[in-house]
Amino acid sequence: MTSDSSDSRPAPAGSEPRQSPPRRALEWLFGRDVLTSPGAAAESPVGDPGRSVQLRLALLSFLMLFVELALIRWLGANIVYLSYYSNFVLLGSFLGIGIGFLRARSRINLFPWTPVALALLTAFVLRFPVQISHTSGTQLIFFGALKTTGLPTWLMLPVIFLAVAAVMTMIGEGVARTFVQFKPLDAYRLDILGSIVGIAAFSTLSFFNAKPLAWGIITAIVLLVLSGTRIGIIQFAALASLAGLLTANSLISHDLWSPYYRITVGARTQAQTIPVMVNGIPHQAITAAAKRPAIFYQPYTQAPRNPLNNVLVVGAGTGNDVAGALRMGAKHIDAVEIDPMIYKLGTKLNSDRPYQSPRVSAHINDGRAFLSQTKKKYDLILFALPDSLTLVAGQSSLRLESYLFTLQAIQSARAHLVPGTGVFAMYNYYRTTWLKDRLADTLDVAFGHAPCASSVGQHQQQLSVLTVSVSPAAVRCVNTWHRPANVLPPSTDDHPFVYLASNTIPSFYLLTLGLILLASLVLVRTVSGPYRKMTGFADLFFMGAAFMLLETKSVVQFALLFGTTWFVNALVFAGVLIAVLAAVETSRRVVIRRPQLLYAGLLAALAVAWVVPQESLLSLSVIPRFVLAVLIAFAPIFLANLVFTQRFRDVSDSTVAFAANLLGAMAGGVIEYVSLITGYRALLIVVAGLYGLAFLTGRRKLTAAKAAQEGPAALAPTTALTAST
């Protein structure tokens, strides 16, 4: 290995090579790790590098997942387009991490530039936020669609995607340069442990409604610890700038942060309403019940004999609809609101003080989950403007309220109504006739007769109320809904995309995904070199794509069974990582003589998940539902990771193999949009097909592994890893 200094004389024993003044100046500015000698990573010993290096890898993995989660939350709150492109930031993250792993042995070390990239991305977003979403068609309805502010979609989305990929490339390269010093499974184990701590830390911050300033401070501290005395003045200045930008923004904006939204509370208007915006979109206005339009009270006036002994309000928000129910004489109200911060605003700012009433019981929960957990019967169930304006967890195309509007959800609500006189009502600014008709038809199918339908306002500001009863005689309709010839069928729990006008992938999604794939191909080739170095790991690529779909299926399954709350999603992701860790620990100790059996077991687990529809578990009580859901969802995940780890344990190049798997996960994130056509259950078929491709492309490796494992060591504790275990 040659020195970069012009002085070729060997350095004295026990001392570092002397550096030329220009190089010392560069190190002072940019840090001592920016330039790496060719092949330095390749020359690193592989084995047990020691506690300090183990801690470094775990800390790097913590940073990687923590920053990924922070970017998903923060960018989605400031760039409204991202609230509707479900996994846009996630795709950019996987691309970046994959490229970073492919660069593990590059001469130029990009990891020290992470603070600079983060500071630039933060400054750009704060300078050019997008406050209102915009679409150019009617295939997908965004209730928040008003008009565009900020940079246009065609410019903002590519910039954000490339910026996220750049940041995660730098962090991923830092992980990879340490990852390569370990045996593959030892490195993977530390990576998973760091990731588990990362998701636990971010979930804790979400629980305490921490602002982005806290996320930035933790990121800066971890980067300082990882850099140590090798940090350069530019990196230090960038970290200071990052903290300064987030501090200034926190002091100026006075935004509140819930686990779901960036919440902005406006000043009281002349009409004595208080506007509330989430993620830069007008969401609701806190208004006194006496000043609300009469149409909000139609569910009560159309059923004058309803005793209103028990009322359920789903989407209780800041309390407007709860106050309205109290005003109309409700004796007891269960108010369900998913966002704890929105609820707290209602307790403080609503002049009617509905949440302080002894007749009101507040529940911070998902509406569908509450219905599945209660046995109460209600005289009135009201879905009051349940429009989340956000998606679940940055993964899958679910919105927080998706499972409220399916046929099965309305049937569940009907089952909770008092026989004979119970009334169900829902209202919102539906903004398009086909959507209102679709929901009215859903009520018609669930109740067996057409609902009452009333509207006020025009165009996108038209407020519509749909009211129906168990018995047609229980309500007095001024206008009864009439089914048009071209009405769309009700959405279902398997295909819960009520805002999608047809079972297709909207054209703007197709265009965006196509450009993402094209950009990814170009970036991987340009930054990381020829594709041929990954050809030997095609099976790992397909495993990554399949596993991403399995993870998505788990998220949506638990969202249906236990609610779309942030806490449920955090538990699912933590559960996935724990299942992965269990597979790693198993493969570190046990060699499977016939990996083909693992594929067979995985196929059987997928078949069980197919045979037992997720909605069939809703009839069970919470504990048996949870046990069966965990078994059905996590058995395939555990077996899939046994397949992966048995293959990964003996790879010749762990970072390239891991990169192939990560890029496969990105491809899986693109394939996930097929669910808009097929529904989520059909993803199991796609998963089975992808693992079939992994089996076919990896047959030679399976044969070689079997030949190497023949003998008494098979299916016994592995001797090669004894020292590290």
Task: Label each PLM-derived region with a short phrase.
Residues 1-10:
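N-terminal acidic, proline/glycine-rich, low-complexity intrinsically disordered segments
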